[in-house]
Swiss-Prot record:
The keyword Cell membrane does not apply. Part of the 50S ribosomal subunit. One of its GO terms (biological process) is translation. Signal peptide: none annotated. It comes from Spiroplasma citri. GO terms for molecular function: rRNA binding; structural constituent of ribosome. One of two assembly initiator proteins, it binds directly to the 5'-end of the 23S rRNA, where it nucleates assembly of the 50S subunit. One of its GO terms (cellular component) is ribosome. The keyword Ribonucleoprotein applies. InterPro entries: KOW, Rib_uL2_dom2, Ribosomal_uL24, Ribosomal_uL24_CS, Ribosomal_uL24_KOW, Translation_prot_SH3-like_sf. Keywords: Ribonucleoprotein, Ribosomal protein, RNA-binding, rRNA-binding. This is Large ribosomal subunit protein uL24. Belongs to the universal ribosomal protein uL24 family.
Length: 58
């Protein structure tokens, strides 16, 4: 993404995946991973309980 000029606040539309067709502004650009974070699209992962972590949650 070195030459792509995405920046915070740009309005983008998702073209693939579970959120296909969703539009929203960019809230964060992750250039090292070639990804952007879009407002209104959930990206929170669930934490499963383990022996050390008995509390599960979001």
């Amino acid at each position: 993404m070195d030459k792509v000029k995405f920046k915070k606040g740009d309005l983008v539309k998702v073209i693939a995946g579970k959120h296909k067709g969703t539009e929203g502004p960019i809230i964060r650009v992750l250039r090292e991973k070639s990804r952007v974070v879009i407002e209104g699209i959930t990206n929170i992962k669930h934490v499963k309980p383990s022996q050390d972590n008995t509390e599960a949650g979001i």
